């Protein structure tokens, strides 16, 4: 899975023997959108990782149990699990943001394409991409790396300023319950349960409508989002300047032609009815 919401590249613990990896123990506990679990990350290195016809070498990876991402779920799921009614290929792991930045990767969420620069991130490539997309009606939204090593963008919920984590590994845009209520967004009754990726933690989720969801200067009216209690560690709730409301997921990234320039730390969006 291509997961901008994961700072590091992860390999499923059940795939370690398949890839012949040697795993070292660490003291770092596994965490996700809904908190931390008892499990501790392992550490390893992949000698050769092929993506299409591009091969990168000596990739450091974290080892964790990702079995929750491979379960068949009939209910809408959130976090780093993409729900689908048809059979999906087994996920051996996720490609994290660290490698995406290092190799100047560009993600086309709508066309489901990943572009890799073997020579690394290039300011010239980012400048050319910016000129090309803004000339075609895309809105440019700068991303920043927050203290948790997640990429986020400025935004607003019903005019209340906040930030959103940019998470291609999340099927849905998910907002913290308390943040939603403070922004004047009503919360419905329990709609189901969602999995928060690494750590396999599960949380009750609701669905609600936001009158105006802003991502930078890009605005969405009457946006439907998932609402759940998100971990304070993820929200950075103790920091007024760095705090966020939750994650901007694939639902609005894919439907608004999102192009993510990881090397240039920029998100581009365009409304479907724009030409």
Segment roles from a protein language model:
Residues 1-275:
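Pepsin/retropepsin-fold aspartyl endopeptidases
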């Amino acid at each position: 899975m291509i997961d901008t919401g994961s700072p590091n590249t992860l390999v499923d613990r059940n795939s370690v023997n398949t890839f012949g990896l040697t795993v070292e123990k660490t003291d770092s506990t596994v965490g996700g959108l809904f908190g931390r679990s008892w499990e501790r990350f392992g550490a390893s290195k992949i000698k050769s990782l092929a993506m299409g016809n591009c091969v990168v070498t000596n990739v450091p990876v974290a080892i964790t149990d990702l079995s929750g991402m491979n379960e068949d779920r009939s209910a809408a799921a959130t976090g780093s699990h993409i729900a689908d009614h048809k059979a999906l290929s087994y996920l051996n792991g996720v490609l994290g943001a660290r490698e995406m930045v290092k190799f100047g990767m560009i993600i086309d969420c709508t066309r489901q394409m990943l572009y890799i620069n073997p020579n690394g991130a290039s300011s010239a490539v980012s400048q050319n991409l910016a000129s090309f997309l803004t000339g075609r009606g895309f809105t440019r939204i700068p991303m920043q790396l927050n203290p948790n090593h997640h990429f986020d963008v400025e935004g607003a919920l019903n005019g209340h300023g906040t930030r959103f984590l940019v998470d291609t590994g999340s099927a849905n845009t998910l907002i913290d319950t308390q943040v939603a209520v403070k922004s004047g967004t009503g919360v419905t009754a329990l709609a189901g349960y969602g999995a928060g990726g690494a750590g396999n933690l599960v949380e009750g989720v609701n669905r609600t409508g936001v009158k105006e969801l802003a991502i930078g200067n890009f605005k969405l009216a009457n946006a439907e989002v998932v609402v759940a209690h998100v971990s304070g560690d993820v929200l950075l709730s103790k920091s007024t300047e760095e705090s966020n409301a939750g994650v901007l997921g694939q639902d609005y990234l894919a439907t608004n032609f999102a192009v993510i320039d990881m090397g240039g730390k920029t998100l581009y969006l365009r409304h479907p009815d724009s030409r």
